[in-house]
Curated annotation (Swiss-Prot):
GO biological process, one term: protein localization to outer membrane
Keywords per UniProt: ATP-binding, Cell inner membrane, Cell membrane, Membrane, Nucleotide-binding, Translocase, Transport
Name of the protein: Lipoprotein-releasing system ATP-binding protein LolD
E.C. designation(s): 7.6.2.-
Function of the molecule: Part of the ABC transporter complex LolCDE involved in the translocation of mature outer membrane-directed lipoproteins, from the inner membrane to the periplasmic chaperone, LolA. Responsible for the formation of the LolA-lipoprotein complex in an ATP-dependent manner.
Coiled coil, from the record: none
Residues engaged in binding ATP: 42-49
GO molecular-function terms, A-Z: ATP binding; ATP hydrolysis activity; transmembrane transporter activity
Domain of life: Bacteria
UniProt record similarity statement: Belongs to the ABC transporter superfamily. Lipoprotein translocase (TC 3.A.1.125) family.
Native source species: Idiomarina loihiensis (strain ATCC BAA-735 / DSM 15497 / L2-TR)
Domain ABC transporter: 6-228
Length: 228
């Protein structure tokens, strides 16, 4: 038994490229504790996003095991994985993936409605989070009417609306300038402290990564703890 919230054991991922087998990840062992913030860094194409997709149940490993609170998830079917993601995970990407025809409030409320909450209850929860991330004056604005930093704040609010245990963030500041990127990182740090949500943050920005509790380096398909 382990007290890890999310962990993997000897996780590997390979692809067929014509007649060749390309190995992206090799025997990854990783554990995330409740409330922990971990950065995963590495060169472009090193497999960082692939690792995040495997940990989030968005892709299947070629071999190895994935556990959530000591329950093995590797054999789960797609519908069970989808339900688990909706109840326990939040996702933030480099591109915000907001639905353009919906307002900020409607975008943030959507995961709540998918989880079965009434529209009224979902919008109340969404409004509280949008106020928390500093967008109380942007509730009715659509994504095209928001700045890049504001759109990413909406995406973060959406990731938190179902009170996830873990947020997986893939280059969450990749499309932002330095000042906006720093403000997004500070927001994630604050939410971690306030809500106890664990984070795995994939990033190429070493300066920002160093603000987190632990840095793991992915190189040649192998995950290494950064030596301080």
């Amino acid at each position: 038994m382990t007290d890890a919230l999310l962990r993997c054991k000897e996780l590997s991922k390979s692809y067929q490229d014509g007649g060749d087998q390309v190995t992206v990840l090799k025997d990854i062992d990783f554990a995330l504790q409740a409330g922990e913030m971990v950065a995963v860094v590495g060169a472009s194409g090193s497999g960082k996003s692939t690792l995040l997709h495997l940990l989030g149940g968005l892709d299947k490993p070629s071999s190895g095991q994935l556990f959530y609170k000591d329950q093995e998830m590797t054999p789960w079917k797609a519908d069970k994985l989808a339900q688990w993601r909706n109840q326990n995970l939040g996702f933030v990407y480099q591109f915000h993936h907001l639905l353009p025809e919906f307002s900020a409030l409607e975008n943030v409320a959507m995961p709540q409605m998918i989880a079965g909450k009434s529209p009224t209850e979902a919008k109340q929860q969404a409004e509280q989070l949008l106020v928390r991330v500093g967008l109380e004056h942007r509730l009715s604005h659509r994504p095209a009417q928001l700045s890049g930093g504001e759109r990413q704040r909406v995406a973060i609010a959406r990731a938190f609306v179902n009170k996830p245990q873990v947020v997986l963030a893939d280059e969450p500041t990749g499309n932002l300038d330095g000042e906006a990127a720093e403000s997004i990182y500070q927001l994630m740090l604050e939410l971690n402290q306030e809500m106890g949500t664990a984070f795995i943050v994939v990033t190429h920005d070493l300066q920002l990564a160093e603000q987190l509790q632990r840095v793991e380096v992915l190189k040649n398909g192998i995950l290494h703890k950064e030596q301080g």
